[in-house]
């Protein structure tokens, strides 16, 4: 009877190991994306700060591909604020995803611990 339990534990450990490795990769990817979004947000904030120091009648050009489009100061300001808002929302989503992944790995580890405790009790 010990052999089936050992096979069951071995299978559970290999599944846990695969899940941990997969989760670690996903968490690293989420961290990289969060860092990139933080840089984007900071860049937009700094650009907006510089733009707001200029007088309202200043001509501003937005780079679009290989050309530049004349924009008002207010339009560029609104675009930069929207960019910051979108980055902040994506950061929150990634943080939630990251915490979910970490929680799921912890639950899997707890299940294996319970399995080991049940085996020792037998």
Swiss-Prot record:
CDD domains: Prefoldin_1
One example of a Gene Ontology biological process annotation: negative regulation of amyloid fibril formation
Residue numbers bearing the N-acetylalanine modification: 2
Domain of life where this protein originates: Eukaryota
Alphabetized InterPro entries for the sequence: PFD_beta-like (IPR002777), Prefoldin (IPR009053)
Protein family (similarity comment): Belongs to the prefoldin subunit beta family.
Function (record text): Binds specifically to cytosolic chaperonin (c-CPN) and transfers target proteins to it. Binds to nascent polypeptide chain and promotes folding in an environment in which there are many competing pathways for nonnative proteins.
The protein's name: Prefoldin subunit 1
